């Protein structure tokens, strides 16, 4: 029996009933992407980017949900255990629906990262490869088939996507050590 009250389904219902033609996965990807690019966690900047994706100003209930989502992401990225929970359909949803949401999440992440990245040429080889992987995943969202192999592939990609933002966030939010002051002897 499908889980009707999953966070993904609740957010999807809220967005569609408010007239916003976007998936929760893409919205969550956008938020994580912008956060990992160094945009910070200021609510106003997030709401501006979200409104653009939503194709209009969000109503109060959607605005509250967006702020809550941002607080969740901030907590995930700044806590000691740094664990990212992806906003995707539940495991009992059809594989095609979950795979499409993974692709939408990647598209959102890349958009958020691209809009807010200060200097992508300064990224490490590993970080650049992560972004290339996300672009590839966004393109193959329809390639997973309903089978044990398809399910296994989906889980593998999902686990990768839980780790990828952490690498990018850590890299783009490195604190630069102050230069040592010359001592006067």
Curated annotation (Swiss-Prot):
SUPFAM superfamilies: YgfB-like
A GO cellular component entry from the record: cytosol
Domain of life, source organism: Bacteria
Classification via Pfam families: UPF0149
Residue ranges crossing the lipid bilayer per the database entry: none
Family designation: Belongs to the UPF0149 family.
Protein name per UniProt: UPF0149 protein PFL_5969
Taxonomic lineage from the root: Bacteria, Pseudomonadati, Pseudomonadota, Gammaproteobacteria, Pseudomonadales
